[in-house]
Structure formats: C-alpha cells, structure tokens
Amino acid sequence: MQVILLDDVKALGKKGEVVNVSDGYARNFILPKKLGLEATPKNLNDLKLQKAAEAKLAQEILEQAQALAKEIESKSILLKIKSGEGGRTFGSVSTKEIAIALKEQLGHDIDKKKLVLNDPIKNMGTYTVPVKLHPKVTAELKVKVDSL
C-alpha cells in the first residue's frame, strides 16, 4: 500500500514522502497513529498543491532576503564610542551594538545572532560585518567605528 507520510517516521521516510509499506503496517500502525494518509489520487493532488505553495513561499522569502541584502550593502552605519590614545576603545563593539545601530540608522530589525563577528571590534576604523539573512544569502554590512 502506498502511504503519504504526515510526519517523519524512522527507517521509513520524511514528512511529505510517498512510500510503499505492507497493508498491515499501514492499517495497524501508520494510519491509526496519524503518521500518514493513504495515497489516493485526491490526497496525492493535495500533497502536490501543498508542496507548490511551500516552494512559492520559500522563493518569496529568498527574494525578500536578497532585496534586503542589496539595501544593506549599499549603506553603512556609524558607531560612536569612547576611546583613548592611539584609537583604542574603552570596551569593544559587539553584535548587540551593531544590531541596535542597524535598527536606529537603517530601520531594519535584524537579530544579533545573524551578524557574524569573529572577534569584538576594539579599534577605530571601518569594518565589514557579514550578515546571514538567509541560508543562501549573506550581506556585507559596512560599520564605521569613530570616537565621541
């Protein structure tokens, strides 16, 4: 019997896959536990429509991320912090400060976890900070650190 899986089933398949199982396994385990549906033409058509809608939504999210990446890369943000002699800062600039400045100056509320900063910024100057907007889209944000 062919079954459309509604949930991941160990050693059988992932959600949305159509798999062949024995009639008894389908009737006694998969169907009663609502782990799958019988693969009727109507259910297969519903699955096809659902996958098409999910693909369209994923494409829209990707396009939004690409548009945001273009906007972020075309602009830069300025951070003013206290500094001592030789351009050394008191403290450091972390992803939290960059995310706050990004929201205030450009109006984009981006989570600090999406900003990739290997080490905190401790000197004055201009830096490029990668921003992971989507698994397939990374933008380069220009951050200028200046003294007060």
UniProtKB/Swiss-Prot annotation:
GO terms for molecular function: rRNA binding; structural constituent of ribosome. One of its GO terms (biological process) is translation. One of its GO terms (cellular component) is ribonucleoprotein complex. It holds the Pfam family Ribosomal_L9_N. It comes from the Bacteria. SUPFAM superfamilies: L9 N-domain-like, Ribosomal protein L9 C-domain. The keyword Plastid does not apply. InterPro entries: Ribosomal_bL9, Ribosomal_bL9/RNase_H1_N, Ribosomal_bL9_bac/chp, Ribosomal_bL9_C, Ribosomal_bL9_C_sf, Ribosomal_bL9_N, Ribosomal_bL9_N_sf. The keyword Transferase does not apply. Keywords: Ribonucleoprotein, Ribosomal protein, RNA-binding, rRNA-binding. Binds to the 23S rRNA. Belongs to the bacterial ribosomal protein bL9 family. This is Large ribosomal subunit protein bL9. It comes from Lachnoclostridium phytofermentans (strain ATCC 700394 / DSM 18823 / ISDg) (Clostridium phytofermentans). The lineage of its organism: Bacteria, Bacillati, Bacillota, Clostridia, Lachnospirales. The gene is rplI.
